[in-house]
């Protein structure tokens, strides 16, 4: 470690000489170095300031500020001198400091759990890309999905003066939501079941999707229906389960429901084992997401020697990359990831400020059914 190599020559001196053979200290660590007779001279260095640029260019501090402010008036010769000085010194505008003076930081917090799952990672990619395109910077806060961890994450977002937070996991307490709004922070809840006023809720019409997949199963001749879910119990997962059960009940049909573990592949295998060992073995299983569906299909084929879709029809949700693989060829619903990201960022960029007295705002999007080979007659 660096502190193990440094032997201070003077406790009060900002310059320390250390004898090493081949040590390079990168400039981006905010330290510059030079070699002097086989020694490395380490000098602590703060970021280049606008005042330093002004002095080098021979202009005023305000001229530097105007040069780096879009639309501001500055003479061409002055701009040229400032830009040359900035390039020579390695100066970059401190957008954080500038934003705080304008009461905006440009920071948007993404509060999320299970970032490694295919759907969640694709959503993070889309949201961060749209934020960057709009001139915002994303600050990712990883939570454990519990509501308490979401509350802590939002308090952290307030401390960093974030302009907004986009919540992909968990649900904040009403008092925390109001605290965010009172501090001028806008909120977006994605696939969260919450009727608190102020935030924008972006949800899918999960119940409508469940009704469509039920119709597909019935047309394929399926009569013994099942739903495979996890024990996570997120609003979107439960909406799909309840929508499927309700749609079946409307046709006088029952649904065998099994829940286990997380929304992952291994949980799907366990759920399939429970469902397929029942006396009334299902001939159609709607899975809360694609990872569960992949586990269900593999268990059905390898443990129970069943043919998909000839003996068992399976459908999933999310349209992750694996769903299109020939080994699964899974019929599923595609989450409108780009539309979700676009609408979330557009809401944050729209005129107006956060208001704890605002009305409930909900945007419901459509999930596209992607037909593949896991349902007969698709």
Question: Where do the PLM segments sit?
Answer:
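N-terminal helix-turn-helix DNA-binding module of bacterial transcription factors
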Residues: 5-104
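Short helix-capping segments at alpha-helix termini
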Residues: 133-134, 183, 247-254, 278-280, ...
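Short beta-strand scaffold positions
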Residues: 54, 167, 286-288
């Amino acid at each position: 470690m660096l502190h193990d190599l440094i032997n201070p020559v003077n406790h009060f001196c900002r310059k320390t000489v250390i004898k090493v053979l081949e040590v390079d200290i990168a400039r981006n660590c905010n330290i510059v170095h030079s070699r002097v007779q086989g020694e490395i001279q380490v000098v602590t260095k703060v970021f280049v300031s606008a005042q330093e640029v002004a002095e080098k260019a021979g202009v005023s501090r305000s001229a530097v500020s105007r040069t780096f402010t879009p639309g501001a008036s500055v003479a061409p010769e002055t701009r040229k001198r400032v830009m040359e000085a900035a390039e020579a010194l390695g100066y970059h505008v401190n957008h954080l400091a500038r934003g705080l003076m304008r009461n905006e930081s440009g920071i948007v917090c993404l509060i999320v759990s299970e970032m490694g799952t295919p759907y969640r990672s694709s959503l993070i990619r889309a949201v961060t890309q749209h934020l960057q395109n709009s001139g915002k910077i994303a600050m990712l806060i990883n939570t454990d999905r519990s509501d308490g961890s979401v509350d802590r994450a939002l308090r952290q977002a307030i401390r960093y003066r974030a302009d907004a937070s986009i919540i992909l996991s968990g649900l904040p307490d009403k008092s925390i939501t109001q605290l965010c709004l009172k501090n001028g922070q806008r909120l977006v809840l994605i696939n969260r079941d919450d009727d608190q006023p102020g935030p924008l809720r972006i949800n899918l019409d999960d119940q409508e999707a469940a009704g469509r997949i039920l119709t597909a199963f019935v047309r394929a001749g399926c009569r013994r229906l099942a739903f495979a879910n996890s024990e996570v119990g997120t609003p979107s997962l439960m909406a799909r389960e309840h929508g499927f059960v309700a749609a079946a009940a409307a046709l006088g049909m029952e649904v065998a429901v099994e829940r286990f573990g997380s929304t992952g592949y291994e949980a799907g295998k366990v759920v399939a084992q429970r469902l397929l060992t029942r006396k009334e073995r299902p001939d159609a299983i709607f899975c809360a997401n694609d990872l569960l569906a992949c586990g269900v299909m593999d268990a059905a084929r390898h443990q129970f020697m069943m043919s998909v879709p000839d003996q068992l029809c399976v459908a999933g949700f999310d349209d992750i990359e694996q769903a299109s693989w020939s080994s699964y060829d899974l019929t599923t619903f595609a989450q409108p990831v780009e539309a979700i990201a676009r609408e979330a960022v557009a809401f944050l960029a729209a005129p107006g400020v956060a208001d704890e007295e605002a009305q409930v705002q909900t945007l419901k999007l459509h999930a596209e059914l992607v037909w593949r080979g896991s349902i007969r007659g698709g």
